[in-house]
From Swiss-Prot:
Provenance organism: Paraburkholderia phymatum (strain DSM 17167 / CIP 108236 / LMG 21445 / STM815)
UniProt entry keywords in alphabetical sequence: Cytoplasm, Isomerase, Porphyrin biosynthesis, Pyridoxal phosphate
EC number: 5.4.3.8
Subunit structure, as described in the record: Homodimer.
Gene Ontology MF terms: glutamate-1-semialdehyde 2,1-aminomutase activity; pyridoxal phosphate binding; transaminase activity
The protein, known as: Glutamate-1-semialdehyde 2,1-aminomutase
Gene3D superfamilies per the UniProt record, alphabetical: Aspartate Aminotransferase, domain 1, Type I PLP-dependent aspartate aminotransferase-like (Major domain)
Protein family (similarity comment): Belongs to the class-III pyridoxal-phosphate-dependent aminotransferase family. HemL subfamily.
One Pfam match: Aminotran_3
Catalytic activity: (S)-4-amino-5-oxopentanoate = 5-aminolevulinate
Modified residues (N6-(pyridoxal phosphate)lysine): 265
NCBIfam families, per the entry: hemL (TIGR00713), PRK00062.1 (NF000818)
Gene Ontology CC, one term: cytoplasm
Cofactor(s) needed for function: pyridoxal 5'-phosphate
Length: 426
């Protein structure tokens, strides 16, 4: 049986950095990444046979736990019929109907294979619909790795955005304006300065890639008002928070209706699937009806659709979200109490089945506030918990996830491990 370290060394010979997505490499926290052998319910096991309570859930999709028997059965039924057809299926219609029913702002929906495809396509559609080029995003929000979204703010409001990745041309980045999350005044100033140039504003209504940060109702309300006033397309990126924070997503929680919505993670049930959709008049601009091109060989893949459709059916069970939210709330409250007992500056927050852990005196409301958290102490806490068999996100800038498979005993085991970890850090 090879060790995690042996597998990591072997992986680095043929895979850049040894991983297929950077956060998996443990660069933020240090140490050796765990190579996963199998998973079940709220747990997974690494290559060395060690079991962990999993609070990543494949970064959100596993809301009903790993290898849920009904999801597994749905996938197995489809496998014998074919893996991929490159032609439409009835199942694609069924999942589209289910999504439109659960998220009323999505009058029509187009399936894709990843969150990046969803946001990239939604932005192209918004530009085609408005015949404008400028987009607005917010510091700390992650919308995938399309060139126009790997951009940070310039030195002032009216300056061009700057690329955050090598390989992103400045000529592309200059069309993206980056503002502070939850800053209504900056938003109003930007629209006043160049509102008639803005094709779209894209936002995570509950951010999860600068850790968990909630948008304020005032901020989202201002977004809706200004986009309507200036004819800009408001895009909610709910790839992470969609079906995670409520059955109808963050837009249900806040009572805000965006023009377009991007979904992913949960709608694939652990398989590669995502979607974007919204107002019928905007979606009519997509090929083959309109002039905005978008396509994908594996879009609406029957195996992914089967897993996603069954997951969407399971989360509609009576009391599902009440139980999920209650368990997540208990987790963050008990973690906060354990830190308080050890006199460690620490706070936590949760929305539905998402949560954030902050080594800080208060819950952050922006990327600047997140950046002031004690990252070295988080890293030490992460490794203490990992040693105790609890797997949190290997970065101080990522949210965590609870599933319906996390029962009271699982949460209690987590808290018991945390008490020891906090005491050792005091």
């Amino acid at each position: 049986m090879p060790s995690n370290q042996e597998l990591f060394e072997r992986a680095q010979k043929t895979i850049p950095g040894g991983v297929n997505s950077p956060v998996r490499a443990f660069r933020s926290v240090g140490g050796t990444p765990r190579f996963i052998e199998r998973a079940q319910g709220a747990y997974f096991w690494d290559a060395e046979g060690k079991r962990y309570i999993d609070y990543i859930g494949s970064w959100g999709p596993m809301i009903v736990g790993h290898v849920h028997p009904e999801v597994l059965e749905a996938v197995q039924r489809v496998l014998s019929k074919g893996f991929s057809f490159g032609a439409p299926t009835e199942a694609e219609i069924e999942i589209a109907e289910e999504i439109c029913k659960l998220v009323p702002s999505m009058e029509q929906v187009r399936m894709v294979s990843s969150g990046t495809e969803a946001t990239m396509s939604a932005l192209r559609l918004a530009r085609g619909f408005t015949d404008r080029s400028r987009i607005v995003k917010f510091e700390g929000c992650y919308h995938g790795h399309a060139d126009s979204l790997l951009v940070k703010a310039g030195s002032g409001l009216l300056t061009f955005g700057n690329p955050t990745s090598a390989g992103v041309p400045v000529d592309i980045a200059k069309h993206t304006t980056v503002l502070e999350y939850n800053n209504v005044a900056a938003l109003e100033e930007a629209f006043s300065a160049f509102g008639n140039e803005i094709a779209s504003v894209i936002v995570e209504p509950v951010a999860g890639n600068m850790n968990l940060v909630r948008a304020t109702p005032e901020f989202l309300g201002a977004l809706r008002r200004l986009c309507s006033e200036y004819g800009s397309v408001l895009i909610f990126d709910e790839v992470m928070c969609g079906f995670r924070v409520a059955l109808g997503g963050a837009q249900q929680l806040y009572g805000i209706r965006p023009d377009l919505t991007c979904l992913g993670k949960v709608i694939g049930g652990g398989m590669p699937a995502a979607a974007f959709g919204g107002r019928r008049d905007i979606m009519a601009h997509l090929a083959p009806l309109g002039g905005v091109y978008q396509a994908g060989t594996l879009s609406g893949n029957p195996i992914a659709v089967a897993a996603g459709l069954k997951t969407l059916q399971l989360i509609q069970a009576p009391g599902f979200y009440d139980a999920l939210s209650r368990r997540t709330t208990r987790l963050v409250q008990d973690l906060t109490e354990a830190a308080r007992e050890a006199k460690i500056p620490f706070t936590a927050d949760s929305v539905g089945g998402m949560f954030g852990l902050y080594f800080s005196e208060s819950v952050p409301a922006s990327f600047a506030e997140i950046s002031r958290c004690d990252v070295p102490r988080f890293n030490a806490f992460f490794h203490k918990m990992l040693d105790a068999g609890v797997y949190f996100a290997p970065s101080a800038y990522e949210a965590g996830f609870v599933s319906s498979a996390h029962d009271d005993a699982t949460v209690e085991a987590t808290i018991e491990a945390a008490r020891g970890a906090f005491k050792s850090l005091a």
